[in-house]
Each structure stands twice: as C-alpha cells, then as structure tokens.
C-alpha cells in the first residue's frame, strides 16, 4: 500500500479510508495477530500522510469481522443470549478501532511523530423508509441448510436468501446514511490536531424518532457512503482509499481489465451506468 503524498500535501483536512481487506486479507483466517500485522502495514502509509502536515480522520470497513461476531453469536446461542446485529456492528467498530489506534500509535512513536489518537464510536442515522429495508441484500453470518433457514425465517423473522453453491444466509438491509450523530465532536477533535478513527464499518445504524431519540436497527451501512457523508460534514478536502488493489479498474478481473488513474465525475457516472463497478466494490 505505497502512497505518493505529493497529492495530499496541500490538503489540510484528509480522510483516509481503510478497506476491510486492509485489516483481514483474502485467504487469511482473521486472527488478532494477523489483523495487527496488516494494520501495522497500513499505518506506514498513514504515518506518511500525517508527516506531510495533513489533519486526518480514519474510517475503515469491518470486513469479515462483524460476520465473525455474528457466527460466534449463533454458535453460543444456547449458552448466552445472542446480541442484535447493531450491537455486533458496535463491537467490531470498537475492536478494529483499537487495532488501528494502537498500531498507528506505535508507528508514530517509531518515526518520532507526536499526535494524539482516539477512536470515536460512531452512530449513523438511517431513514426507516429507505427502500433497502424492503429488499435486504447484504449477506451476513454463516450458511444454513434449507430446513434451518426456514426455521430461522419463521422464528426470528430473518430474511434468508440462497447461495446456489453453499446454502442459505441471512440478508440485511444496507440503507444510505443520512446523518453522522458524532460528526460535530469528530470535526472539533480533528481541528485540534487529534487523529480521529471514526465511522468504522460504516458506523452503527440507528433510527431517529420525531423527538430526536435514537434506537439501533439491524442493518449494515456501506463504509464508503458513511465516509463520503462524514467528509462532507467535516469539510474534508481529500478522501484517500487504501485498499487491496492499486487502482480502480475497468472490466476488473477480466483479461481485458484496464487501470483508471483519473476520471471525471461525468466519466464515473457513465461507468456506473454501464455496470463497470459492482455494488459494494471500491
């Protein structure tokens, strides 16, 4: 994940967004030691950005972490009450935040940079009338056979969809974020020079009542949408995505794939309309 910092030196407010594969890479088991090792590698690039004088906020995906928590929930359901998905979202945001925070702290000490770092557990408001709730598409958790899927659908109200090769999985909504609850304090901390880790895994999805009260909802917010919304609110000038690939590709994964180093907004929209970028991809 090498990074040329020349493009960001003039930007005073920068968001660095870590993809889920920056913490747990393809083919790995996802052990804590692997996650720390991967985070340490990502933090080398992040420390270069910090040394260039940028004020940064870090967001990150929760990759397989929240799914693994969900699997642990189900495996121990006979022993302890399983937690709802939004609590699993919060758990993964906290644990991955710690891994990134500690790794960056150690990296900055190694290169003699003094900056405070904090992880902010972030709630993200979603609209209960979002069409994503009518047609859940985001798969989470383990695979089940057809009989188990029918029982879970009946007893817990889960929406189950079949993967033709591996069985049935629960699918949940992935609504668009409309407000970042902690955006104000995130902005203030960043302006004071604190490196803030926020909106991990897209944040914890919540619904806001007419009285302004919040309640969690079982959903998964796309990390990139949450990052873009947060960037707008804190007035970030640059968003940098650190991922497992070196750039955006047209016809990705095919023999004719072609790298795209720069594109206009118009070109990006045209690529989207042509289906070049799969849902959930970078």
Where do the language-model regions lie?
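Glycine-rich phosphate/pyrophosphate-binding loops
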Residues: 203, 234-252
């Amino acid at each position: 994940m090498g990074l040329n910092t020349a493009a960001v030196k003039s930007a005073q407010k920068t968001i660095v967004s870590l993809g889920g594969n920056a913490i747990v890479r393809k083919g790995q088991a996802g052990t804590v030691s692997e996650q720390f090792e991967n985070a340490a590698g990502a933090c080398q690039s992040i420390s270069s950005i910090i040394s260039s004088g940028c004020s940064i906020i870090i967001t990150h995906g929760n990759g397989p972490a929240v799914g693994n928590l969900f699997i642990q929930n189900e495996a121990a359901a006979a022993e302890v009450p399983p937690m709802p998905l939004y609590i699993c979202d919060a758990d993964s945001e906290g644990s991955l935040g710690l891994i990134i925070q500690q790794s960056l702290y150690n990296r900055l000490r190694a290169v003699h940079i003094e900056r405070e770092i904090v992880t902010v557990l972030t709630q993200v408001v979603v609209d209960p009338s979002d069409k994503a709730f009518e047609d859940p598409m985001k798969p989470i958790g383990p695979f089940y056979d057809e009989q188990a899927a029918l029982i879970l659908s009946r007893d817990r109200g889960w929406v189950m969809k079949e993967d033709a090769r591996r069985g049935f999985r629960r699918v949940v909504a992935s609504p668009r974020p409309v407000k970042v609850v902690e955006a104000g304090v995130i902005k203030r901390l960043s302006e004071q020079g604190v490196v803030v880790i926020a909106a991990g895994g897209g944040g914890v999805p919540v619904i806001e009542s007419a009285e302004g009260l919040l309640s969690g909802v079982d959903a998964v917010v796309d990390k990139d949408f949450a990052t873009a919304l947060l960037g707008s609110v804190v007035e970030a000038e640059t968003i940098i995505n650190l991922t497992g690939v070196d750039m955006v590709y047209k016809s990705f994964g095919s023999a004719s794939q072609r790298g795209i180093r720069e594109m206009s907004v118009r070109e990006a929209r045209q690529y989207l309309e042509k289906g070049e970028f799969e849902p959930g991809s970078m």
